[in-house]
C-alpha cells in the first residue's frame, strides 16, 4: 500500500506542477521553438495526438508556439541514431535498455535518468498479444500453438526492434513456466518458434504491414496497442486478438536528452512535454490510443479495453535489461545461436 500511495502522490504532484512550469517557461511573444521526439516504431498515432494537445496547452498558457517533430523506427536503431548524432530533444523508446544506452554509450543523459519521472519514467505500459485472421482459422490460443507445423508467425527482428525483444522474452518466459521448464527447454521452444517465422522486419510497424497489408502469416506477435489499432483501422470483421495465458509487462520509458536540450535551450519545454504525458489529459490520450495508462482513475475508465492477463516482468524473470540483452540479444547471444548470424 505504501508503494502505491507514493506513486500516486508523485503523479499528483507532477500533474499539479505542470501548469506552473508552462507559465514560467516563456512569455507572450516568445520565439517559436521546435522539438524532435525520437520514438519507437508504433507510436506515430499516439504522439500525433499528444503533440496536438500539448502544443495547444503550451500556447494557451505561455503564448509560445511549439512544433514537435517525430522520428520513428525500431527502438534499438533509434537509440543508435541518437548516439550517432540525431538531435533528439526527447527520446521515447521501447525499452529501458535502449534509453540507458544514451547514457552508457553516448553520455547524453545522466545515469539516474530512470528516477526523474514517475513509474521509472514510463508513463504508459503495454504487453504482447497475438493478432490473428478473423475467426482464428489456425485455432491459435497460446504460445505452444506457435510451434505447430504450418503456422506462420510474424515478429520483427530483436536486433533492431524493441517490440521484438519483448516478443522473444515473453515466449521464453512462457516456456520456462511449463512443466520441467528451464533455460534449455525455453531455448528449444523459441528455436522452434523462429523456424515458423518467414520474414523478420526491422520494426513493429513493418511487421504489422507484413501481416495486415501484405497478408503474410497466420499470427502476428504484437504490442497490444498495435493490435488494437490494426483491428480498429481494418474493422472487427478482419482480425481477432488472442490474449495468451501469460505475457510480459512492457514499460516503454521516456527521457529528455540532456546534452541536446542544453545546447538548444529547449530543456523547459522538453521537460514540460514529458510531464504532460502524466496529466489527466495526457493519460486519456494514451488510453484512447490503446496504451495502458498509469493513472488509476483513467485505467479504471478503460478497464474494458484492457483485459486482465498474467504478466511477468523483465526484472523478476530475466534479471533486468542489462542481463537480458547480454544473454539473448548481444552478438553471440541466444538469438544468434537460434537464428544464425
Label the predicted regions.
Residues 1-17, 24:
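N-terminal secretory signal peptides and thylakoid transit peptides that target proteins
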Residues 31-160, 339:
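N-terminal segment of the mature folded domain
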Residues 178-245:
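Ligand-binding pocket segment of bilobal, Venus flytrap-like solute-binding proteins
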Residues 127-136, 251-268, 285-289:
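A bilobed periplasmic-binding-protein/Venus flytrap-type ligand-binding module shared by bacterial periplasmic
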Residues 38-40, 113-122, 132-134, 144, 152-179, 194-197, 231-248, ...:
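Short beta-strand->loop
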Residues 135-141, 160, 173-181, 260-268:
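Short helix-loop capping/hinge motifs at secondary-structure junctions, enriched
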Residues 261-341:
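Extracellular/periplasmic juxtamembrane helices and adjacent flexible linkers that interface
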Amino acid at each position: 500500500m505504501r508503494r502505491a500511495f507514493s506513486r500516486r502522490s508523485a503523479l499528483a504532484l507532477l500533474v499539479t506542477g505542470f501548469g506552473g512550469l508552462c507559465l514560467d517557461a516563456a512569455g507572450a511573444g516568445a520565439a517559436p521553438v521546435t522539438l524532435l521526439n525520437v520514438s519507437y516504431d508504433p507510436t506515430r498515432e499516439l504522439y500525433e495526438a499528444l503533440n496536438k494537445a500539448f502544443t495547444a496547452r503550451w500556447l494557451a498558457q505561455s503564448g509560445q508556439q511549439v512544433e514537435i517533430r517525430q522520428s520513428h523506427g525500431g527502438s534499438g536503431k533509434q537509440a543508435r541514431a541518437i548516439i550517432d548524432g540525431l538531435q533528439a530533444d526527447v527520446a521515447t523508446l521501447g525499452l529501458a535498455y535502449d534509453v540507458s544506452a544514451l547514457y552508457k554509450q553516448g553520455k547524453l543523459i545522466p545515469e539516474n535518468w530512470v528516477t526523474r519521472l514517475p513509474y521509472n519514467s514510463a508513463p504508459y505500459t503495454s504487453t504482447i498479444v497475438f493478432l490473428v485472421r478473423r475467426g482464428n482459422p489456425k485455432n491459435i490460443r497460446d504460445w505452444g500453438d506457435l510451434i505447430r507445423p504450418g503456422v506462420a508467425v510474424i515478429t520483427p527482428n530483436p536486433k533492431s526492434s524493441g517490440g521484438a525483444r519483448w516478443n522473444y522474452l515473453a515466449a521464453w518466459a512462457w516456456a520456462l513456466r511449463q512443466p520441467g521448464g528451464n533455460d534449455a527447454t525455453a531455448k528449444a521452444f523459441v528455436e522452434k518458434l523462429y523456424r515458423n517465422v518467414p520474414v523478420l522486419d526491422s520494426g513493429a510497424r513493418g511487421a504489422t504491414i507484413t501481416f495486415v497489408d501484405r497478408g503474410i502469416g497466420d499470427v502476428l506477435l504484437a504490442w497490444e496497442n498495435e493490435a488494437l489499432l490494426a483491428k480498429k483501422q481494418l474493422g472487427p470483421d478482419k482480425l481477432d486478438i488472442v490474449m495468451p495465458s501469460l505475457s510480459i509487462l512492457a514499460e516503454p520509458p521516456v527521457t529528455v536528452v540532456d546534452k541536446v536540450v542544453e545546447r538548444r535551450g529547449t530543456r523547459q519545454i522538453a521537460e514540460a512535454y514529458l510531464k504532460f504525458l502524466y496529466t489527466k489529459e495526457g493519460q486519456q490520450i494514451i488510453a484512447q490510443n490503446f496504451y495502458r495508462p498509469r493513472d488509476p482513475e483513467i485505467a479504471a475508465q478503460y478497464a474494458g479495453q484492457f483485459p486482465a492477463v498474467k504478466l511477468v516482468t523483465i526484472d523478476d524473470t530475466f534479471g533486468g535489461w542489462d542481463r537480458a540483452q547480454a544473454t539473448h540479444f548481444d552478438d553471440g547471444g541466444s538469438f544468434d545461436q537460434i537464428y544464425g548470424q
